Amino acid sequence: MGASVKPAARRNARQFALQAIYSWQITKENVATIEEQFLTSGKYDEEEHRAAEPALAAPETDVSYFRDLLAGVVLNHNELDSKLRPFVSRPMQDLDMMELALLRLAMYEMTRREDVPYKVVINEAIELAKVFAAEDSHKFVNGVLDKAAPHVRKKA
């Protein structure tokens, strides 16, 4: 995997996984249905996101990484929430849905994708929060993940 992984392709996969996770949280639709919607929607509505964040709109996307993130978060959301809970200052049900999706995505990467450095996971979550979440959400996401990282990664 190592050197052949393109950061832009992973970034795109994270963006679309975040949107798909958010969609799943809202609709509770079958994950396969949501995945199919993203895979058949013409480059994941690339045009819509080009104006918001050009770096995220590159045509390449690591589709297998997208699938892993989406399925992994949906299948393990209860476990991910349990790992997040000690580091979140309010009840999980009170979190903004986009913040929850971001935290679940990042926690999945930190706990299940040890090939991705935890600093990369945190930075990518912050950047996604700046684009998709409320104005100061990136600060909240950063704080939670900074506190969680040493507890979920052996040498964080």
Curated annotation (Swiss-Prot):
What is one GO biological process annotated to this record? transcription antitermination
Q: Which Pfam families match?
A: NusB
UniProt keyword Transcription present: yes
Q: Which PANTHER family match?
A: ANTITERMINATION NUSB DOMAIN-CONTAINING PROTEIN, N UTILIZATION SUBSTANCE PROTEIN B-RELATED
Q: Which family does it belong to?
A: Belongs to the NusB family.
Briefly state the protein's biological role: Involved in transcription antitermination. Required for transcription of ribosomal RNA (rRNA) genes. Binds specifically to the boxA antiterminator sequence of the ribosomal RNA (rrn) operons.
This protein's name: Transcription antitermination protein NusB
The primary gene name is nusB
